[in-house]
Each structure stands twice: as structure tokens, then as C-alpha cells.
């Protein structure tokens, strides 16, 4: 079978790009013909709160060749994307969806392609973690252009059925990532982080966003005894100042270790192998 994947993928970094790279690889392993259609501009720089959108040294990225054609904020590229995918003539188009910002381009492509192939949307989030008033109507607009859906959690299935009651979908658990750095022992991991392996090390890992409750975790660690240490590892979208103020005021401030930066794929095992709980 011939698959087209429309998604951010290498050289973009982050979970969606990593997932799409793995999906591409596994479909090829199964003997399918696959082509990736990528963004030439994902987020305009003025709207992107992080350091960079692209892989850097230390990232164990799945290097997938792709056609970089879709520009999220340039409607002309929506037509170019349709033409590029149609010329490939796929049996199935898989669209990676996680936020409504991309609906205008995605919905246009899905609408134009649904007469030529099956259009399946793989939904990471039907409704964003920080929802806005326009997220639901935009998501519904896209979903109505699709033949079917893939969801990976009960919550996303629930959201999909509320937004599009007639949706045809399958649900499979989110697969494990297998492209990170080599495994090391706990003592070595703790040594690299400058923490003690005998302590009860807790980890907050990933992008730091308001909705994730890091402020509550910082307050909670101050109520635990000195055996508990907290590691905060991830890039902050927004200012870290309010979290730093909580740390400075905490009785546990000497037991809180901050790595406020994007953690490369190569470094990830160090953090996860140093702890008792996530």
C-alpha cells in the first residue's frame, strides 16, 4: 500500500516529529511505500516560544527524507501541498494533528484529497492542553473532512466523539520510543547530574508549561523530608522567574536541581535512570 504522511518530521524536533519518523520507519518495515510531506514553515518565529524548532547536536533524530511544502501561514502553500500529494497518488493520507493552529492548511488538504484517497487523521490531542474558544470548531472543521481517525488514549477518544459523533476510529496505545541514548546504571546517571543515588529522586521532565502544575510540585517538595530531591528538566515556554521565586522561597531549595533547557535525546537516559518516580 502507498502511504503519504503529512506532519512535521525531521529536521523538526519534538514529540510529533519523532513520532512521525517512527511511523514512517515502521510502515516501510512492513513493506509499504511511504512518502513524507513536511512543513517548510511550522511556526512563525514570532509565535514560537522556545529556543529552536530544529534538531541540534545530541538529538538522535530519525532522519527521514521529506518534501517540505506546507507553510502553516501561507495559503498558497496549501494548494502546492495538495498538488504534491496528488502527484504521489497515495492510497492513504495520514495527517498528524495536535493543535488547531494548523487546521486551515490541514482542512484544505484533507478536503481536496478525500476524493482521491483515504484521509486518516492521527490525533495526538483533539483539544489542546491550554484550550481556546476557537479550538473545538476548528478541530470539527478538519475532522469532517476525514474518513477515519487513530487515537491513542481514552481522553482523546472521548474528545473526538464529542466533536464528531459519527467518527470512525481505532484506538491503539501510544507506542514506546526506542531511539534514545544508551542505558547506564543509576550511580553513573546520578554522578552526571550531581545528585546522590541513595536519595529519593523525583523528576519533572519535558516542556515547562503553566498547565502542568510545576508550581504545585515545587510547593509539595518542601513538605517532604530531606530524603526527597527534585530534578526539573526541560525547556520553559515563557518565563521561569515565577518558578525560580518559588524555589528560592522553598525550605527544600537545596534539594531542587534545575536544568532549564531542551534535553537532547542523548541525555534523556541520564535523567530517567537517576530517579525513583516521574
Question: What residue ranges belong to the model's regions?
Answer:
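Glycosyltransferase donor-sugar binding loop
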Residues: 40-43, 205, 229-244, 261
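A short helix/loop element that forms part of the nucleotide-sugar donor recognition site in Leloir-type
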Residues: 181-195, 245
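Conserved donor-binding/catalytic core segment of Leloir-type glycosyltransferases
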Residues: 195-212, 218-221, 231
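Nucleotide-sugar donor phosphate/pyrophosphate-binding loop at the beta->alpha transition
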Residues: 118, 126-145, 158, 184
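Conserved small/polar residues in nucleotide/adenosyl-binding loops
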Residues: 276-278
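N-terminal strand-loop element at the rim of the active site
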Residues: 9-13, 24-87, 156, 161, ...
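Nucleotide-activated donor-binding/catalytic signature segment of Leloir-type glycosyltransferases, i.e.
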Residues: 69, 241-266
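Donor nucleotide-sugar binding/catalytic pocket of nucleotide-sugar-dependent glycosyltransferases
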Residues: 144-184
Amino acid at each position: 500500500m502507498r502511504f503519504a504522511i503529512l506532519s512535521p518530521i525531521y529536521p523538526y524536533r519534538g514529540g510529533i516529529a519523532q513520532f512521525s519518523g517512527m511511523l514512517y520507519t515502521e510502515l516501510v518495515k512492513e513493506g509499504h511505500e511511504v512518502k513524507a510531506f513536511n512543513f517548510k514553515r511550522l511556526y512563525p518565529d514570532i509565535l514560537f516560544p522556545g529556543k529552536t524548532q530544529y534538531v541540534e547536536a545530541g538529538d538522535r533524530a530519525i532522519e527521514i527524507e521529506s518534501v517540505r511544502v506546507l507553510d502553516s501561514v501561507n495559503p498558497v502553500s496549501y494548494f502546492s501541498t495538495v498538488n504534491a500529494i496528488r502527484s504521489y497518488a497515495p492510497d492513504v493520507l495520514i495527517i498528524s494533528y495536535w493543535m488547531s493552529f494548523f487546521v486551515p492548511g490541514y482542512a484544505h488538504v484533507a478536503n481536496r484529497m478525500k476524493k482521491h484517497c483515504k484521509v486518516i487523521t492521527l490525533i495526538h490531542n483533539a483539544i489542546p492542553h491550554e484550550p481556546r474558544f476557537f479550538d473545538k470548531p476548528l478541530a470539527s472543521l478538519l475532522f469532517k473532512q476525514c474518513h477515519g481517525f487513530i487515537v491513542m488514549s481514552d481522553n482523546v477518544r472521548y474528545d473526538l466523539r464529542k466533536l464528531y459523533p459519527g467518527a470512525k476510529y481505532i484506538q491503539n496505545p501510544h507506542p514506546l520510543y526506542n531511539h534514545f541514548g544508551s542505558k547506564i546504571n543509576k550511580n553513573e546517571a546520578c554522578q552526571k547530574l550531581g545528585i546522590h543515588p541513595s536519595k529519593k529522586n523525583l523528576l519533572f521532565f519535558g516542556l515547562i508549561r503553566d498547565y502542568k502544575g510545576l508550581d504545585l510540585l515545587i510547593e509539595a517538595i518542601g513538605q517532604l523530608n530531606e530524603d526527597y530531591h527534585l530534578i526539573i528538566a526541560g525547556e520553559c515556554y515563557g518565563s521561569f522567574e515565577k518558578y525560580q521565586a518559588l524555589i528560592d522561597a522553598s525550605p527544600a531549595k537545596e534539594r531542587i536541581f534545575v536544568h532549564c533547557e531542551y534535553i537532547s535525546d542523548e541525555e534523556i537516559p541520564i535523567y530517567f535512570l537517576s530517579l525513583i518516580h516521574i
